[in-house]
């Protein structure tokens, strides 16, 4: 008998409202000098054209804890600055998760009233149960 301990989560959607312009949000996501301030200890690099590379690089703290230098790799599927970014996301921090198929992350940036911008992040996790379990903190 086999027991599957991985969750069935296939899509995560996060929506947040930020008092900033769409361009400022775009820059915070896509420019390494900005995203290293807000993300995990490290930086993300994007080649913002369809087929361009995405890389999340571990900072010194993460590497000191045993993480590899290249944490996540992927490909830019669509880039429409400063409105929409679609990318694949393939974590590499352990063998089990690296063996799974890449997932897909969509960043939708929409200007709202009063100088506020709505950021919606959709992470499609189909066919990646280990990734789903880890990113939903259920592993």
Question: What label would you give each PLM region?
Answer:
Residues 94-138:
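Beta-strand/loop substructures that line and gate deep hydrophobic ligand-binding cavities in soluble
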């Amino acid at each position: 008998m086999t027991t599957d301990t991985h969750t069935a989560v296939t899509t995560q959607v996060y929506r947040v409202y930020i008092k900033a312009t769409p361009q400022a949000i775009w820059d915070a996501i896509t420019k390494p000098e900005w995203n290293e301030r807000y993300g995990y200890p490290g930086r993300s690099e994007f080649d913002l054209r369809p087929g361009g590379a995405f890389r999340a690089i571990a900072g010194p703290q993460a590497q000191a804890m045993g993480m590899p230098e290249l944490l996540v790799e992927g490909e830019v599927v669509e880039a429409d600055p400063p409105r929409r970014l679609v990318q694949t996301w393939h974590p590499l921090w352990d063998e089990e998760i690296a063996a799974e198929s890449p997932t897909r992350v969509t960043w939708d940036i929409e200007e709202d009233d009063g100088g506020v911008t709505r950021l919606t992040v959709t992470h499609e996790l189909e066919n990646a149960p280990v990734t789903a379990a880890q990113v939903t903190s259920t592993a």
